[in-house]
Curated annotation (Swiss-Prot):
The keyword Secreted does not apply. One of its GO terms (cellular component) is cytosolic large ribosomal subunit. The gene is rplL. It comes from Ureaplasma parvum serovar 3 (strain ATCC 700970). This is Large ribosomal subunit protein bL12. Coiled coil: none annotated. The lineage of its organism: Bacteria, Bacillati, Mycoplasmatota, Mycoplasmoidales, Mycoplasmoidaceae.
Length: 121
């Protein structure tokens, strides 16, 4: 058997049908114990963005129950009456920072019940 050059080998592959190419791939896999499947690189896989474990609670709108919102802000933060009132009257006020997501969702639910809107950032 004479040795094929690379050019001859490529020319022979170009002339094969899809079925013949499939048979060739299977024969190579069997002969050499390899797989034609592309290896999956762990680093190349897209990394899913993890949900933040700690968030900041910002007041978007106090709503109509401003007294209830002020009381809730005082309860959550421990602020005095005037500081809590100022926070309730200022849109975008940071109510609490670095809060666990579960706790932040509970606090958000309390604000929602009062008709206020908060944002978890």
């Amino acid at each position: 058997m004479s040795k094929l050059t690379i050019e001859q080998f490529i020319a022979a592959i170009k002339e094969m049908s899809m079925l013949e190419l499939n048979d060739l791939v299977k024969a190579i896999e069997t002969e050499f114990g390899v797989s034609a499947a592309a290896p999956v690189a762990a680093a190349a896989a897209p990394v899913a963005a993890e949900a933040p474990t700690e968030v900041t609670i910002k007041l978007v709108e106090a709503g109509t129950n401003k007294v209830g919102v002020i009381k809730l802000i005082r309860e959550i933060t421990g602020l005095g009456l005037m500081e809590a009132k100022t926070a309730a009257e200022t849109a975008g006020s940071v109510i609490k920072e670095d809060v666990k997501t579960e706790e932040a969702n509970e606090i958000k639910k309390k604000f929602d019940e009062l008709g206020a809107k908060v944002q978890l950032v």
